[in-house]
Amino acid sequence: MRKLFTIVLSLVAFIGISVSTANAKTLKCQTVLNTKADEVKMLKDFTDTVTTLTDGSLKFEILPAGAVVGVKETLDAVDKGLIDCGFAWTHYWSGDHPAAMLFGSPVAGGGVGIDNLAFLSWFQYGGGKELYDQLWKEMGRDIKGFMLQPVGPEALGWFPKPIKDMADFRKYKFRTPPGIPGQTYKDIGIASVAMG
């Protein structure tokens, strides 16, 4: 892959090579969240660890959603080199490829049917990582995805009153990722607003 992020993180994670700080590089990483989100704080912990492991030769500038491009354009911006890396859930791009639902935190589980430990085992040892790489190729993106923070399925929601039937359910408006989740809500007559 042509992305420096891929090469350097692969070396750091698997070989442990340290590079001189004279060749320091700062990678711009745009998230799909604001910088106060817990997930972004965990991302900063990860990038701080990478900076420590590389003796300061690799640093990250974490940018909030929309800093360079809109949320929906984050993946394309990485592919085109406008930003060095992005941080999001893969299911944001399920509208581009339905298999993206397998690798994110789909609303209400999205039919995956396994817990986080089983998911991590499948990803690491059961062929999931290879399918993840194949996903990006099939989407025509020249990127390398890394799994950080597998969070499992998102909750369907928190409601002020019990939902007794679909008529009750259709009274609500949902925030949802673009792609399959948003389309599913639309197909069953529920108003949804795509994130981003």
Predicted regions and their residues:
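Sec/Tat signal peptide C-region and signal peptidase I cleavage site
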Residues: 14-24
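Contiguous mixed-secondary-structure segments that line small-molecule binding/active-site clefts
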Residues: 47-51, 79, 84, 89-195
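Bacterial N-terminal signal peptides that target proteins for export
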Residues: 1-9
